[in-house]
Curated annotation (Swiss-Prot):
UniProt name for this protein: Probable alpha-L-glutamate ligase
Alphabetized PANTHER family for the sequence: RIBOSOMAL PROTEIN BS6--L-GLUTAMATE LIGASE, RIBOSOMAL PROTEIN S6 MODIFICATION PROTEIN
Organism (species): Alkalilimnicola ehrlichii (strain ATCC BAA-1101 / DSM 17681 / MLHE-1)
ATP-grasp domain mapped to chain residues: 104-287
Top-level taxon: Bacteria
Residue sites binding Mn(2+) 2 per the record: E260, N262
The encoding gene: rimK
Pfam families per the UniProt record, alphabetical: RimK, Rimk_N
Cofactor comment: Binds 2 magnesium or manganese ions per subunit.
Obligatory cofactor(s): Mg(2+); Mn(2+)
Cellular-component GO terms for this entry: cytoplasm
Length: 301
């Protein structure tokens, strides 16, 4: 197959592994920077151009689109979909999962277990928002954050109110969420490919930190997940409409809960922790499913 990877940095571990794994399996693989792509939006012959050449005749496209370029990156991916190129994850599914509020509402609608979460606008409702999640300690998440950035632990009522006031003063939206103290700063990343959990790892926050993200110094190790957790991860990815997803779970006193569904999960932590060839598994999915024009909107809302 002829595969295109949309990535701003070909030296990143995940991008390198996807190139290596594809070529090892006999595929032609090319990496292009989505921000250098530009489009001819035509009803008769839609095109994508890159540094003066036309990009065409690809069997599949693998989006590795960072959160900061979601708008433009998904526009480029959508243009490939219009041209009939099979996307590993569809543009609409990526946009859906990147919106923390929208994705939380959709997961809740389908009965997926979540930490108690509130969202509001008026300063008059701040105290009620805090009380609805059980009071401090509590987590406040910026809707635009990624890799643990914009996620703050408020340990007291005064800290919670001050943080909420500060975020409102900056005119940014946020979620207030219960803090799962019994998790001890750990969560579980389930890597879903084609409605199967193909690998899972435990991420443990470094001492003095409650965020377990690998980018923030968290340590990865192998973990055995339960059948219920496996089913929950697959369902969460399906609700988002994602073929490939990193579903983050946290174990609470009242069962496992979904923290987030990531549409562009990194490969380094989970491949090194588990020893599994996740990049190869992604290509196995593409080999089975990538067909010209086989683009359809998955998920709802």
């Amino acid at each position: 197959m002829n595969i295109l990877i949309l990535s701003r940095n070909s030296r990143l571990y995940s991008t390198r592994r996807l190139v290596e794994a594809g070529r090892e399996r006999g595929h032609q693989v090319r990496v292009v920077d989505p921000l250098r792509c530009y489009m001819n939006i035509s009803p008769h012959k839609p095109e994508i151009h890159y540094k003066g050449e036309t990009l065409e005749n690809f069997d599949g496209v693998i989006p590795r689109i960072g959160a900061s370029i979601t708008f433009y990156g998904t526009a480029v991916l959508r243009q490939f979909e219009i041209m009939g190129t099979f996307p590993l994850n569809e543009s609409v599914a990526i946009s859906r999962s990147r919106d923390k509020l929208r994705s939380t509402q959709l997961l809740a609608r389908k009965g997926i277990g979540l930490p108690m979460t509130t969202f509001g606008y008026s300063p008059d409702d701040t105290e009620d928002l805090i009380n609805l999640v059980g009071g401090p300690p509590m987590v406040i998440k910026l809707l635009e954050g990624t890799q643990g950035k914009g996620v703050v632990l408020a340990e007291t009522q005064q800290a919670a109110e001050s943080l909420i006031d500060a975020f409102r003063g900056l005119n940014v939206h946020f979620l207030a969420q219960e803090y799962i103290k019994e998790a001890g700063g750990s969560d579980i990343r389930c890597f879903v490919v084609g409605e199967r959990v193909v690998a899972s790892m435990r991420r443990q926050a470094k001492e003095g930190e409650f965020r377990s993200n690998i980018h923030r110094g968290g340590q990865a190790s192998t973990v055995r997940i339960t059948p219920e957790e496996r089913s929950m991860a697959v369902r969460a990815a399906r609700i988002m409409g994602l073929n490939v997803a990193g579903v983050d779970l946290i174990r609470s006193a009242h069962g496992s809960l979904v923290l987030e569904v990531n549409s562009s999960p990194g490969l380094e932590g989970i491949e090194k922790a588990t020893g599994k060839d996740i990049a190869g598994t992604i290509y196995a999915f593409l080999e089975k499913n990538a067909r010209q024009g086989k683009t359809r909107t998955r998920g709802r809302g």
